[in-house]
Amino acid sequence: MGSDVPLFLIGGTVLGLDRGQEVYPLPDLEPVWCVVATPAVGVSTPQAFRDWDALCVEEGLTPEASADKLKQLSRAYAGAFAVGLPEGRPAGEGRRAGSSGVPPVGGDLAGPLESALVRTGITSWIANDFERVVFRQHPSLAEIKRILSGSGTPEAALHASLSGSGSALFGLYQAREAAESACGRLQAAGVQGTVTRTLPRDRYWSEMLQADER
């Protein structure tokens, strides 16, 4: 089983640890518009890992530094959403499970995503380290991220990033109009893009069960 699979056994907003095989449910964020860019270029995941390992050796990076960054992100998330969990206890433990079999954690989070993420400063901790090595090998992907970001425009993305090791990228937007505008910019640059929306956990499982019945 691939390390990407456990996420889809829970759905919604989750915390993934290690290679992604350890996953904990978090309070759901409000649905947000998203654009997924799927460039024609391919990226070798094994090569991306080798390049990242080489960069870590070159810069003297250690696993402890990554762990510290994860702890800072977790504190920022908990502070922003007032998620009080006993130390060492996974989110949602001991609560009644929903249709997904996953206990709810504090309910869906009200308020616009911009307030939940941007104003709390959590976006400053969101990063994909693969960008540092993948963009060196594939500069066109860095340009696609720039297009998705739309910096300096009224319809700028809340966040844009490489997805995993690539080559897909994504952008998050407050409004559908902003997402459609970003998708239009991609298509004008000859890059395939898809406008979609994130799903909270309950909606994810509702649609999964309906699809299974069909």
Language-model regions: role of each:
Residues 1-21:
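Contiguous, small/hydrophobic- and glycine-enriched helical/loop subdomains that border
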Residues 16-159, 174-187, 192-214:
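Conserved, helical-rich catalytic subdomain that frames metal- and/or nucleotide-binding sites
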Residues 161-163:
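Flexible helical/loop "lid" subdomain adjacent to adenine-nucleotide binding pockets
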Residues 166-169:
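Conserved glycine-rich beta-strand-loop-beta hairpin in the small C-terminal domain of fold type I
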